């Protein structure tokens, strides 16, 4: 795939910020922002295509305006047989006035016009779609450059709709502007010149006034409709977001029997969309009716003037037909003009929203002169780190600790202590508010984000997979890995045997977010792709907390293999998984209050020991419940677990 320089994206982002700042002003800001993509400096072939398309457009309009003359000549020739007024003998009109010749000329002109238009549109499509591709790619890349905070605060469904509509808006505005708007203006000018020279100033003035009034009414009515379309788009985005959110949480909806509740939420959004859509269609009817009245009045006026001139002996019958043909030819571009204005206005709205995204500056960005991270051993050090998501609520309060190269350090603590925040800071999803984080002595703010994240592998608590094959999801850790390397990673993650039982093996589709796989299977895929990545630093962010005890033990064995000889940070919920850690850090309210090995912390009798004892008591209670349920099941069902009398206890035992 062809790549485009990030500097272009930067220029577009700068233009986008200028557009957002001056949104109430000139909408030509959008055109200025988009023009470099229609007239690309690095593509002389596309520039030549634009120029040639405009030349073809000019020839097509000249042929279009010439077509009514063939009507005039044919009509005058036919009228001669009826004794009507005809052009004087010897004139060009007389010589070309034979009905057959005039009709053939009309046919040739129409064929030429059609061919010129189609060739022009076919050629310009390459320019338009190249602009769409570049802008869509730059916007997509910019979205990935934006901070985690931006994505957490935005609705994914709404964001994808913004990208989709922005892409379509760019396509529409380039096509409508250069292939419809500009040719229509040229045709208007040519028709006025013909009326002024072939007839007189009255006809030109009448048509000019009609065009001006038609466009004024169209602009005012369309501005009114735009407000309605905005409301309709917002309702559509809201309904679409609710639908995506509900379907992504399909199982949760089923757990709580909330189908009717979800349908009600969706229907309320669709009701708002319905009202806005009805208003949109009503306003469109008003617009079309007004346009028809304005054009019909002007057409009738010109025909009356031509009829009076014929009666006065100043015009021929062919002139009457020519005026009618010119006016009717104007109706098509005029009607398109209304549609063009509506589309351009709507496209501007859609592009504005895309520009809003482009105007967002990344919260975390590479500093000028940032160098790649040079990993020698992978030691990590946090020095008096202060961090907050909200300035009024500090999460980490002067946190300091070290993870020696090749060692495993676990971070534990109650909910809200700041455990997962540490992993996000290490990956530099956020910058610290105070202190610094170093890897092998290098401040992570001074190195490139790409090199930093390339050195770190993550196995998260909630693994989300791409809606693709198992092979694709494992190979995501290293796209250039061979099939054998992928299989070896799967064997180390203890998922190769499971994959072998699937009918499609490694090319099995995992479904949306990997929902076709169980939690344990998804975790093994995540472990396999981390093994394939082979990073010197590993973060296990509560990687087994969402799994049952049996699956947890199996996954833990795979994790132990991955962590061997790597600098490893374990964010732990279940303390039984980190008893062998080289050092355990105990956080509470963003502060390090204890550290040491498992034995040292237990002997100290502090918060860690309290958390450990609490978890052990909970585990023993679950074991007692499970055993009681098993005995009850054997008594009632002959060894078959049937605990229908106490489903709550059964669920608690399995949780």
Label every model-predicted segment:
Residues 366-367, 373-655:
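ABC-type nucleotide-binding domain
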Residues 1-36, 78-83, 626-655:
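Membrane-proximal cytosolic tails and large cytosolic loops of membrane proteins
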Residues 39-44, 148-152, 165-174, 178, ...:
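An intracellular "coupling" helix at the cytosolic face of ABC transporter transmembrane type-1 domains
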Residues 102, 106-113, 117, 210-215, ...:
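Hydrophobic alpha-helical segments in the permease module
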Residues 52-59, 179-230, 304-315, 319:
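Transmembrane helices of ABC transporter permease
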Residues 30, 46-116, 196-205, 300, ...:
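Transmembrane helix-loop-helix hairpins at lipid-water interfaces of multipass membrane proteins
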Residues 258, 282, 330-359:
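Cytosolic ends of transmembrane helices, especially the final helix of ABC transmembrane type-1 domains
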Residues 15-24, 41-43, 129, 137-167, ...:
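Short intracellular "coupling" helices and adjacent cytoplasmic loop segments at the cytosolic face
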């Amino acid at each position: 795939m062809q790549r485009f320089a990030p500097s272009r994206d930067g220029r577009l982002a700068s233009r986008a910020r200028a557009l957002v700042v001056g949104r109430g002003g000139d909408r030509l800001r959008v055109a200025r922002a988009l023009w470099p993509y229609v007239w690309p400096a690095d593509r002389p072939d596309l520039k030549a295509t634009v120029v040639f398309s405009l030349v073809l457009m000019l020839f097509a309009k000249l042929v279009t305006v010439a077509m009514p003359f063939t009507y005039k000549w044919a009509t005058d020739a036919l009228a001669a047989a009826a004794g009507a007024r005809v052009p004087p003998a010897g004139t060009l009109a007389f010589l070309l006035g034979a009905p057959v010749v005039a009709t053939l000329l009309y046919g040739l002109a129409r064929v030429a016009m059609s061919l010129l238009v189609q060739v022009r549109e076919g050629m310009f499509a390459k320019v338009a779609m190249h602009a769409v591709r570049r802008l869509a790619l730059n916007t997509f890349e910019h979205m990935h450059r934006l901070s985690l905070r931006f994505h957490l605060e935005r609705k994914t469904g709404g964001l994808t709709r913004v990208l989709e509509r922005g892409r379509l808006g760019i396509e529409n505005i380039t096509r409508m502007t250069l292939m419809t708007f500009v040719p229509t203006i040229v045709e208007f000018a040519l028709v006025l010149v013909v009326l002024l020279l072939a007839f007189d100033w009255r006809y030109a003035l009448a048509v000019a006034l009609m065009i001006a009034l038609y466009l004024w009414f169209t602009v005012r009515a369309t501005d009114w409709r735009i407000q309605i379309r905005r409301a309709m788009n917002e309702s559509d985005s809201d309904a679409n977001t609710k639908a995506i959110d509900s379907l992504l949480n399909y199982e949760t909806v089923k757990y709580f029997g909330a189908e009717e509740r979800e349908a009600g939420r969706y229907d309320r959004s669709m009701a708002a969309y319905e009202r806005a859509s009805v208003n949109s269609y009503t306003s469109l009817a008003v617009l079309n009716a007004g346009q028809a009245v304005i054009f019909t009045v002007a057409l009738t006026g010109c025909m009356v003037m031509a009829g009076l001139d014929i009666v006065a002996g100043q015009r021929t019958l062919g002139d009457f037909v020519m005026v009618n043909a010119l006016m009717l030819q104007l109706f098509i571009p005029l009607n398109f003009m209304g549609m063009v204005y509506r589309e351009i206005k709507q496209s501007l709205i859609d592009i504005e929203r895309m520009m809003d995204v482009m105007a967002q500056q990344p919260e975390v960005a590479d500093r000028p002169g940032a160098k790649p991270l040079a990993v020698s051993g992978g030691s990590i050090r946090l020095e008096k780190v202060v961090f907050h998501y909200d300035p009024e609520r500090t999460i980490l309060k002067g946190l300091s600790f070290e993870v020696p190269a090749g060692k495993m350090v676990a971070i534990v603590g109650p909910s809200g202590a700041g455990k997962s925040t540490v992993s996000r800071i290490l990956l530099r999803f956020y910058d610290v508010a105070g202190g610094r984080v170093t890897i092998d002595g290098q401040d992570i703010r001074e190195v490139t984000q790409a090199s930093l994240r390339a050195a770190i592998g993550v196995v998260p608590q909630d693994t989300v997979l791409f809606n693709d094959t198992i092979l694709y999801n494992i190979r995501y850790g290293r796209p250039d890995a061979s099939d054998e390397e992928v299989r070896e990673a799967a064997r180390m993650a203890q998922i190769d045997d499971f994959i072998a039982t699937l009918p499609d093996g490694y090319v099995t589709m995992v479904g949306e977010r990997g929902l076709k796989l169980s939690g344990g299977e998804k975790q093994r895929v995540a472990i396999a792709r981390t093994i394939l990545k082979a990073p010197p630093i590993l973060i296990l962010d509560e990687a087994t907390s969402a799994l049952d005890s049996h699956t947890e033990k199996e996954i833990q064995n795979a994790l132990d293999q991955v962590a061997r000889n790597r600098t490893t940070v374990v964010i732990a919920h279940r303390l039984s998984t980190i008893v062998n850690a080289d050092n355990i850090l105990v956080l509470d309210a963003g502060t390090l209050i204890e550290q040491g090995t498992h034995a040292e912390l237990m002997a100290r009798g502090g918060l860690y020991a309290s958390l450990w004892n609490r978890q052990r008591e909970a585990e023993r209670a679950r074991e007692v419940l499970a055993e009681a349920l098993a005995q009850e099941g054997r008594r009632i069902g002959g060894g078959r677990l049937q605990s229908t009398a106490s489903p709550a206890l059964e669920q608690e035992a399995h949780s």
